[in-house]
Design a protein with these regions (language model features):
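Active-site beta->alpha loop and helix N-cap motifs at the rims of alpha/beta catalytic domains
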Residues: 2-153, 158, 270
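Glycine- and other small-residue-rich loops at beta-strand/loop junctions that grip anionic moieties
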Residues: 19, 45, 74, 145, ...
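Active-site pocket-lining/capping segments in soluble small-molecule metabolic enzymes
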Residues: 19-21, 101, 114-138, 152-158, ...
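Short, surface-exposed basic-aromatic patches at helix termini and helix-loop junctions that form
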Residues: 59-62, 86-91, 184-193, 279-286
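Short, well-ordered secondary-structure micro-motifs
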Residues: 110-111, 144-146, 181-182, 207-215, ...
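Hydrophobic, aromatic-enriched interface-forming segments
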Residues: 147-160, 166-188
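Flexible, glycine/charged-enriched surface loops at secondary-structure junctions
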Residues: 255-261
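A short, acidic, flexible beta-alpha connecting loop/helix-capping segment that sits on the rim
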Residues: 265-273
């Protein structure tokens, strides 16, 4: 599929980015790296304090960003804790959007085992949150079977219809555009209507990407980056997601019904560097390459 600079810039608009509470302490000013209103997800990692997630969400809101804190189901104690966290998120950080995930914990620490259990409490709606993200898995999950994933997508679509709430899927990071496009088409044909934010690995060394892929990546993406990492001489080479973005943009432009809507960046190579790259792509400050993909034009 062919793609134009306009296709890529259009697909890259309204991107979002991720930050950990620990990583946020190294960022002096979010406003220096991001345009006002940029969506920034704040993680709630296993073993971390959810109050740190709220504190960074408040800081982001104070700097004019749309803070989207994670709610990790299997890291919550009970409904009372969930209620308290949502109350704090909305009152202290003016949160109006959250991302609800299962969370990377083998054994739940409390009463919740899945995203749907959190959604079905009704507590998110109680606090006036109008937009909810849930996780998507284009390449499957090491913890959940494909059949279970299909059922979960069906349940989330039904929840969105029943509650009349804006629900979207945000995915793990990927490297293979064809795998993502095939997954999107398959879940759409199965009846899913949820818009999708695709996880994009920001520019980083192959060594760094391989490390994160070992933790999270499976399927085509893991094979792709493992092949790159075999060349020791290239381990410290910075790899950008230009071919992935071009491939996804081509697929989005070619299919008006495609559910892919936005890109969500994982800043593995640095927050400011990833934000600058995402902004350049969104602005169309790129040059198409003869063999596919593009390069960011020098300023």
């Amino acid at each position: 599929m062919s793609v134009t600079i306009e296709d890529i810039a259009r697909s890259a608009a309204n991107w979002s980015i991720e930050v950990t509470p620990a990583g946020a302490t190294k960022i002096d000013s979010f406003a220096d790296a991001l345009a006002e209103g940029t969506t920034v997800n704040v993680t709630f990692l296993p073993g971390s304090d959810p109050l740190d997630t709220i504190a960074i969400s408040k800081r982001l809101a104070d700097e004019g960003m749309n803070a989207v804190p994670h709610i990790a189901a299997r890291s919550l104690q009970d409904s009372a804790q969930l209620d308290d966290l949502l109350k704090r998120m909305t009152a202290e950080a003016n949160v109006r959007e959250v991302l609800v995930i299962g969370g990377g914990v083998d054994k739940p620490v409390g009463e919740f085992d899945s995203t749907m259990q959190v959604l079905n409490t009704g507590l998110i709606q109680k606090y006036g949150i109008t937009t909810i993200g849930v996780s998507g898995h284009p390449e499957g999950s090491p913890d959940i079977s494909d059949e279970q994933l299909a059922v979960a997508i069906e349940q989330k679509n039904e929840f969105a219809r029943k509650e009349g709430i804006s629900l979207y899927m945000e995915t793990q990071f990927c490297f293979d555009a064809n795998a993502v496009l095939a997954w999107e088409k398959s879940i759409r044909q199965a009846g899913s209507q949820l818009p999708i934010r695709i996880g994009i690995p920001g520019p980083a060394t192959i060594k760094t990407l391989f490390r994160f892929a070992q933790i999270s990546g499976i399927g085509p993406s893991m094979r792709f980056i493992a092949k790159q990492a075999r060349n020791v001489a290239k381990l410290m080479t910075v790899q950008s997601p230009h071919e992935l973005l071009a491939g996804l943009s081509a697929g989005m432009a070619a299919d008006k019904d495609c559910l892919l809507q936005h890109f969500h960046y994982y800043p593995f190579g640095g927050f400011a560097k990833t934000a600058a790259y995402a902004h350049a792509v969104e602005q169309g400050n790129i040059k198409l390459l003869p063999k596919g993909g593009f390069e960011v034009a020098p300023e």
